[in-house]
Amino acid sequence: MSEIVFAIPGDLSLPTGGYAYDRRLLAEWREMGVAARHLPLPGGFPTPSEVDLAETGRAILSQPYDGVLLIDGLAYGAFPESVAAGLAGRVVALVHHPLGLETGLSPKQAAEFVRREMAALHYASAVVVTSETTKRLLAADFAVPAERVTVAEPGVDPAERAAGSGGKTVELLAVGSLVPRKGYDVLIAALEGLADKPWRLTIVGADDRAPATTAALMAQIAATGLSGRVRLAGALGQAELDAAYANADLFVMPSLFEGYGMVLTEALARGLPILCTTGGAATETAPDDAALKVPPGDVGALRAGLARLLDDPKERRQRADAAWHAAGALPRWRRTATIVAEVCAKVSP
């Protein structure tokens, strides 16, 4: 294998879990001496135009044949079957989560994403996923043989334990882009019924990826009378994000589905108690003793979980201790990068 050509659509600097994973692979490989480079693809994926597809074809076909193509699933899952077939024998597909499981799609759109991604994955020599949950999902619903799928869980860096706010008001923190799948509307609906309790919520995440969702969330916050208690912080730099984690008393993740849930391990690394859903891999990412878990999309269950933890500082401390204990066993990025590089080496033409 001469090198890994890592094809990634859109802006690699965007503050999402998927792009963070991709950035970290490239950074680790540089330190490890693994020959790898980033091949930018158009930003129109997963709904590319004909121009996007033509540009993608030119970019990929211009790569040396002895390099292995590692293609982010945001693009590869949307490739027409004819394009995927033409790359057979050279591709490792990186699936963060199946495209058809994104919330907010019509049934027709979701079915088309599933059909196209299933067809493309048939031609991938190997598939890398970020969780055992996604591996099982690809085997069950996308006809991908389990022996072709390798799990490379995201790593996490060691961090200082969160000190918390130190006040009587419980500081809630949620991290993730404002997109339908993150379930922030469910969180606000749950908190609406807890106005008599002492809490404040900060949501950190890009607010420009789904403008309609952001507008609806802002309107919901205003309509529920929670504007003074809910802060939409937008995307933050690393120092500001670290400060938000350090000041938090409880981490909340109301996602409807997660292919892994990298923010959960970031919370664990800082010893934060967690309230999360069982959507996708989230139920496995956070240990049961560190996280109170509720079904995704269930306003009543989320409200009950919030009330329980807001009312019981002792339980929050116990779950915080469990999270801090789990932090020492979390995977590191060097191991993640090694696993993916080994998969690519086996596929090298």
Language model feature labels by segment:
Residues L264, P273-C276:
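Short hydrophobic beta-strand element within catalytic cores of glycosyltransferases
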Residues D288, L292-G300, A307-K314:
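Conserved acidic donor-binding segment of nucleotide-sugar-dependent glycosyltransferases
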Residues T214-L236:
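Nucleotide-activated donor-binding/catalytic signature segment of Leloir-type glycosyltransferases, i.e.
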Residues L256:
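Aromatic "clamp/platform" in nucleotide-sugar-dependent glycosyltransferases that forms part
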Residues A163-K182, I188-G193, T202-V204:
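Conserved donor-binding/catalytic core segment of Leloir-type glycosyltransferases
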Residues A235-L236, A243-A248:
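Short alpha-helical donor nucleotide-sugar binding micro-motif in glycosyltransferases
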Residues T133, G155:
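Carbohydrate-associated surface elements
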